Amino acid sequence: MRRLIALFGAAFLLINVFSKAYAQGDEGALAIIVPGGGTYSRPITTDSEEAQAFFDQGIRMAWGFYFPESIASYQEAARLDPDSPMPHWGIAHAAGPNPNSRYQGLPDDPQGAGLAAIRRAMELADNG
């Protein structure tokens, strides 16, 4: 019975979070801000407070080894401010080699996403 209650509670929470994201009206969004995800901020050159928030969330997610979620947050920051190089740096950081993948014998940056992202960041580096 406790498992059933926990399952319904988790389902309700997920529905609540995603319905709020959908209600915000941005159907092209690649990620949402996860409440309670921390407060660390690393200022980047951007005029978009939302892009800054997603960049910060990307760092916090990467530090927690939530790499797919981190990449989604960085991609959303890049979508919101396409001229900022740092979201692309973040994608490279999260998509590139990490100790866990090497321990499992997985290849570094198997699809080349990290290399492509760092190249894009270098192209935009003069923007800030």
Where on the chain are the PLM-derived regions?
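Positively charged n-region of N-terminal signal peptides that target proteins for export
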Residues: M1-L4
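Bacterial N-terminal signal peptides
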Residues: A6-K20
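Short coil/linker segments at helix-helix boundaries
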Residues: G25-G128
